[in-house]
A protein has these predicted regions:
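Conserved small/polar residues in nucleotide/adenosyl-binding loops
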Residues: 167-168
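N-terminal pre-domain/capping segments
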Residues: 1-129, 148, 152-163
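Flexible, glycine-rich active-site loops centered on histidine and acidic residues
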Residues: 139-147
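Short, conserved phosphate-binding/catalytic loop or strand-edge motifs used
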Residues: 132-139
Length: 168
Protein backbone atom coordinates (compact mmCIF):
# COMPACT_ATOMS: atom_id res chain seq x y z
CA UNK A 1 0.00 0.00 0.00
CA UNK A 2 1.21 3.53 -0.77
CA UNK A 3 2.16 5.89 1.99
CA UNK A 4 0.25 9.05 1.14
CA UNK A 5 1.11 12.30 2.92
CA UNK A 6 -1.19 15.28 3.25
CA UNK A 7 -0.72 18.90 4.26
CA UNK A 8 -3.10 21.60 5.43
CA UNK A 9 -2.98 25.30 6.21
CA UNK A 10 -4.34 27.05 9.30
CA UNK A 11 -6.60 29.12 7.02
CA UNK A 12 -8.47 25.95 6.06
CA UNK A 13 -10.19 26.16 9.45
CA UNK A 14 -11.50 29.70 9.71
CA UNK A 15 -14.37 31.77 11.01
CA UNK A 16 -16.40 31.45 7.82
CA UNK A 17 -16.26 35.18 7.12
CA UNK A 18 -16.20 35.97 3.42
CA UNK A 19 -17.38 38.52 0.85
CA UNK A 20 -20.96 37.33 1.40
CA UNK A 21 -21.20 37.74 5.12
CA UNK A 22 -19.71 37.91 8.60
CA UNK A 23 -18.08 35.18 10.63
CA UNK A 24 -20.26 32.20 11.51
CA UNK A 25 -18.05 30.67 14.19
CA UNK A 26 -15.34 31.67 16.64
CA UNK A 27 -11.66 31.83 15.74
CA UNK A 28 -9.60 28.82 16.84
CA UNK A 29 -6.07 29.43 18.07
CA UNK A 30 -3.39 28.56 15.50
CA UNK A 31 -1.55 26.18 17.80
CA UNK A 32 -4.78 24.39 18.68
CA UNK A 33 -5.48 23.94 14.96
CA UNK A 34 -1.99 22.56 14.38
CA UNK A 35 -2.30 20.11 17.28
CA UNK A 36 -5.59 18.86 15.84
CA UNK A 37 -4.05 18.56 12.35
CA UNK A 38 -1.32 16.34 13.84
CA UNK A 39 -3.95 14.20 15.59
CA UNK A 40 -5.79 13.84 12.28
CA UNK A 41 -2.67 12.46 10.61
CA UNK A 42 -1.49 15.37 8.48
CA UNK A 43 2.23 15.30 7.68
CA UNK A 44 2.92 18.97 7.03
CA UNK A 45 1.54 22.44 7.51
CA UNK A 46 1.27 25.13 4.84
CA UNK A 47 1.86 28.66 6.11
CA UNK A 48 1.28 32.20 5.05
CA UNK A 49 3.96 34.40 6.56
CA UNK A 50 1.42 35.88 8.97
CA UNK A 51 0.12 32.43 9.94
CA UNK A 52 3.63 31.50 11.01
CA UNK A 53 4.27 34.86 12.67
CA UNK A 54 0.99 36.61 13.52
CA UNK A 55 1.18 40.41 13.41
CA UNK A 56 4.33 40.11 11.31
CA UNK A 57 4.42 43.85 10.55
CA UNK A 58 4.99 44.59 14.24
CA UNK A 59 8.33 42.76 14.46
CA UNK A 60 11.92 43.23 13.39
CA UNK A 61 13.60 40.76 11.08
CA UNK A 62 15.35 39.06 14.00
CA UNK A 63 12.16 38.89 16.08
CA UNK A 64 10.41 37.25 13.12
CA UNK A 65 13.17 34.65 12.87
CA UNK A 66 12.96 34.00 16.64
CA UNK A 67 9.21 33.43 16.42
CA UNK A 68 9.71 31.14 13.42
CA UNK A 69 12.30 29.11 15.37
CA UNK A 70 9.82 28.72 18.23
CA UNK A 71 7.19 27.53 15.75
CA UNK A 72 9.69 25.03 14.32
CA UNK A 73 10.19 23.55 17.80
CA UNK A 74 6.42 23.27 18.19
CA UNK A 75 6.05 21.54 14.81
CA UNK A 76 8.92 19.18 15.64
CA UNK A 77 7.26 18.26 18.95
CA UNK A 78 4.21 17.13 16.98
CA UNK A 79 6.15 15.35 14.25
CA UNK A 80 5.04 17.86 11.62
CA UNK A 81 6.97 19.55 8.84
CA UNK A 82 6.39 22.92 7.22
CA UNK A 83 5.56 22.39 3.55
CA UNK A 84 5.89 26.00 2.38
CA UNK A 85 5.58 29.63 3.38
CA UNK A 86 3.77 32.20 1.23
CA UNK A 87 3.66 35.96 1.70
CA UNK A 88 0.02 36.97 2.20
CA UNK A 89 0.20 40.16 0.19
CA UNK A 90 -3.45 40.68 -0.65
CA UNK A 91 -4.65 41.53 2.87
CA UNK A 92 -2.63 44.70 3.52
CA UNK A 93 -3.39 48.26 2.44
CA UNK A 94 0.11 48.48 0.91
CA UNK A 95 -0.71 45.72 -1.52
CA UNK A 96 -4.36 46.38 -2.39
CA UNK A 97 -3.22 47.29 -5.92
CA UNK A 98 -0.79 44.40 -6.15
CA UNK A 99 2.41 44.80 -4.21
CA UNK A 100 5.01 43.84 -6.79
CA UNK A 101 3.20 45.61 -9.64
CA UNK A 102 2.06 48.66 -7.70
CA UNK A 103 2.76 52.11 -9.09
CA UNK A 104 3.90 53.06 -5.57
CA UNK A 105 7.60 52.45 -4.90
CA UNK A 106 6.80 52.29 -1.17
CA UNK A 107 4.25 49.54 -1.74
CA UNK A 108 6.64 47.57 -3.96
CA UNK A 109 9.30 47.86 -1.24
CA UNK A 110 6.81 46.60 1.35
CA UNK A 111 5.93 43.62 -0.87
CA UNK A 112 9.63 42.75 -1.13
CA UNK A 113 10.01 43.07 2.65
CA UNK A 114 7.19 40.56 3.13
CA UNK A 115 8.60 38.25 0.45
CA UNK A 116 12.03 38.31 2.11
CA UNK A 117 10.45 37.61 5.52
CA UNK A 118 8.63 34.64 3.98
CA UNK A 119 11.97 33.30 2.77
CA UNK A 120 13.47 33.87 6.23
CA UNK A 121 10.55 32.07 7.88
CA UNK A 122 10.76 29.18 5.41
CA UNK A 123 14.46 28.84 6.16
CA UNK A 124 13.85 28.80 9.92
CA UNK A 125 11.04 26.24 9.56
CA UNK A 126 13.03 24.04 7.19
CA UNK A 127 10.33 24.45 4.55
CA UNK A 128 11.67 23.40 1.14
CA UNK A 129 9.84 26.11 -0.79
CA UNK A 130 7.87 29.30 -0.82
CA UNK A 131 4.69 29.85 -2.78
CA UNK A 132 3.95 33.13 -4.50
CA UNK A 133 0.21 33.74 -4.85
CA UNK A 134 -0.22 36.75 -7.09
CA UNK A 135 -3.78 37.44 -5.93
CA UNK A 136 -3.93 41.18 -6.60
CA UNK A 137 -1.14 41.52 -9.11
CA UNK A 138 -2.03 42.48 -12.64
CA UNK A 139 -3.28 45.27 -14.82
CA UNK A 140 -7.04 44.95 -14.50
CA UNK A 141 -7.56 48.60 -15.37
CA UNK A 142 -5.40 49.22 -18.44
CA UNK A 143 -5.24 52.94 -17.73
CA UNK A 144 -3.80 52.45 -14.23
CA UNK A 145 -0.37 51.18 -15.29
CA UNK A 146 1.60 50.00 -18.26
CA UNK A 147 1.32 46.21 -18.58
CA UNK A 148 4.91 46.03 -19.86
CA UNK A 149 6.24 48.13 -16.98
CA UNK A 150 4.18 46.22 -14.40
CA UNK A 151 5.32 42.84 -15.71
CA UNK A 152 8.93 44.03 -15.55
CA UNK A 153 8.38 45.00 -11.90
CA UNK A 154 7.11 41.49 -11.17
CA UNK A 155 10.03 39.85 -12.96
CA UNK A 156 12.48 42.05 -11.04
CA UNK A 157 10.80 41.10 -7.74
CA UNK A 158 10.97 37.38 -8.51
CA UNK A 159 14.62 37.68 -9.54
CA UNK A 160 15.41 39.46 -6.24
CA UNK A 161 13.76 36.61 -4.33
CA UNK A 162 15.72 34.03 -6.31
CA UNK A 163 18.98 35.92 -5.65
CA UNK A 164 18.41 35.93 -1.90
CA UNK A 165 20.68 33.46 -0.16
CA UNK A 166 18.58 30.74 1.36
CA UNK A 167 17.94 27.03 1.52
CA UNK A 168 14.57 27.50 -0.18
Amino acid sequence: MSNFKFSVGPWNVNTGEDAYGPATRKEIDRDEKIRKFAEMGFSAIQFHDDDAVPNINDYTEEEIKEKARALKKFLDSLGLAAEFVAPRLWMDEHTADGGFMSTSAEDREYAMWRAYRSIDIANELGAPMIVLWLAREGTLCAESKSPVWATKQLIDAINKMLDRKSVV
